[in-house]
Amino acid sequence: MRVASFESKGIEKVGVFYKGKLIDIDLVSEIIGHKLDKEFPAFFNVVDIIEQWEYVEKLIEKGEKLFKSEFLKFFEVKNPLLTAPIIRESKIVCLGKNYAEHAKETGSKPPEEPIIFGKFADCVISHDEEIIYPDFATRVDPEVELAVVIGKQGKDVDAEEAMDYVFGYTIANDITERELEYADMKKGWPWFRSKNFDAAMPLGPWIVTKDEIPNPHNLEIELSVN
């Protein structure tokens, strides 16, 4: 299943794609709760969906039983304006030189230990928003990445258990001001200024749950410029 954030009448909302249609899961919860005289959780953002995923599946099942063939018609979001599937409080942890081919492009080998850096969540824009270059930019490069969405809190997780913490996947574009990055690297400085400016992280358009991608190591990611 796919999880998406969208804007409706100026309000940020969240939904899931079911049978090819985006449905407003918060509205589903509200209406079904009213019909059954039960209290179901509210869903305001993607974190609510991730943390209460078992309710999402139950609500869809109950909705199909109650509304039958009218379910999708009643709850479908028409012409949605998709926004980045993230909340501003999210943590974005990135890996440098994580693709062997990309490492070769830089003239180096893939590192034995992960090279970790971070990006601020307020750098994120939706997948089809315009990327505005900062005034100081001389060379801006796109870097398309597979983004792994962590679904629950963990610490000191063993490698064998790591996938238990994954909720799903989306696509990220790690926009980088390359000349600034190289200049900072020569000084031994971190990759911070070159990767943390407004609009430096297009993300989305949605999150695909991990059950739909049994082998995330066998995916093709493609990016085109202009």
Say what each PLM segment does.
Residues M1-P114, E212-P214, E222:
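N-terminal non-catalytic cap/leader segment that marks the start of a structured domain
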Residues E89-N226:
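Glycine-enriched loop-and-adjacent helix/strand subsegments that border the catalytic/binding cleft
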